[in-house]
Amino acid sequence: MSEDAQHPRIHPTALVHPQARLHPTVQVGPYAVIGPQVEVGEGTVIGPYVVLDGQVRIGRRNRIHAGVVIGCEPQDRNFRGEPSSVVVGDDNVLREYVQISRATGEGAATVVGDRNYIMSMVHVAHNCYLGSDIVIVTGSGLAGYVRVDDGAQI
């Protein structure tokens, strides 16, 4: 990875679109793919093989582990290609192979709050709202429009 303090540390095999907005302290691992509408905040670490696509805003100090996919089209028959997004807050841990879909509905968002610990192979579907300080265990799946309030354990 490059060592320039003025630019994110991006592994040479990662594909980062030139329009993506990454804070200078972001680290991007091998073979990650980051699309043009992605914004990543200060101190976030993106692991290998991560895909961030579509309109995605990720806050500060998140740890995004290998194989995570954020911002893919929703798995919803009502989705017609309308612009929607994923918003991830600060200080979250997303373990291996977590998948978070964009929302259905123009301007709608799938939201993940702050300080959540989402274990491996968790699916967060379209239009979900996750508060803060939540733990979701390995292999859990949240269907579309699920709301999880602060402090929940699933």
Feature annotation, model-predicted:
Residues M1-R9:
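Short, low-complexity, intrinsically disordered N-terminal peptides in bacterial proteins
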Residues R9-I154:
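Structural signal for interior beta-strand "rungs" in well-ordered beta-sheet cores
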